[in-house]
Amino acid sequence: MKTKLTLIPIFLLITLTLSAQRHILSVPELPGYVTLKCDFHMHTVFSDGNVWPNQRVGEAWRDGLDAIAITDHIEYQPHKQYIPVDHSAAWKIASPIAADYNIILVKGSEITRKMPPGHLNALFITEPDSLVKDDFMKAVEAAVAQGAFIEWNHPGWKSQQPDGIPRMYDVHRELIAKGWLHGIEYYNDVEYYPLVMDMCRDNQLAIMGNSDVHGVISEEFAAPVYSHRPMTLVFAKERTMESLKEAMFARRTAVWYGDNLAAPEELAAPLFQSVITAGIPFRDDGKRIWFELSNTSDIPMKLSGGPEGAPATLTVPAHGMVVVRADRKFLAQPVTYAVDNIITGSNNVLKVEISPAKK
Ligand code: ZN
């Protein structure tokens, strides 16, 4: 008896020590909001994934995420010979672990159909069993009745859209007309669909990016090829489930994948400004000025198309600084650049104006 009692604290200590390595992410912010790092599309053994649900929480914590959704398929259970079909099981198993790790666990499911309509995640649902319906529209209706955020997943996935080009079908237009579609994956797994930027802009939908992980995340997005999984950045009033949901319906989202950020035009400029700072010129030789440009984020900023009298291209490294030497005229007018890795449309990147700080 005595032996058992002493074993308990040692076991707890080992558990805490093994899990105590969270990566802190530095990403752009929107003034007045907190940036929540999120992955809203992942699978477990309860559909076609290969991991137990609580592993998703540990992975998310180590990866520096704030919120996740486990979205097992409603209509596809390849492991059912060994694991019973239970659409709430993953959420039930992962919930207490999420509470221990301070991870916001959104309850979700993936409605899984042929294209059209394809695959759609229902997020913030309460009763996944109610989505088990032959009629697709009835399944979405049931989700929406629970206050769901409906995300159209990987619309250009080659298994369903062989040329990789996403297309809106009548069923998607019908969903939009009813107010039953709220976001589209611009980025999924390791691929992205440029036209989704325009679809979201034209239809007032949130742009989303998720891992759609089925195996172990650190193996599917392994270093050195990947420094982080693809994720949705959500600009919420607070770090709570309610604020997260409000922000998503209000379309305050961006997608971070590789060294790129995809964001709606109206959010892109403030996001860039939140991490890039131009210093006061520290040298002036009467013809040219020298000033520093620094970046506090994990995302290098790749500038091109600079005007005459300034560098044509500049990369401000992640957590780094460069010195800009430019014509003195830029004391009175901004230096203009395209930011090649901040994507605002299928054919557009962010344009910025940079002015050295005033003395
Ligand atoms: Zn999926």
Stretches found by the model and what they are:
Residues M1-I8:
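Bacterial N-terminal signal peptides that target proteins for export
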Residues K2, Q21-C38, V57, M115-I125, ...:
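Charged catalytic cores and adjacent phosphate/nucleic-acid-binding surfaces used
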Residues P9-F11, A60, F330:
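Amphipathic, positively biased hydrophobic alpha-helical segments used for protein targeting
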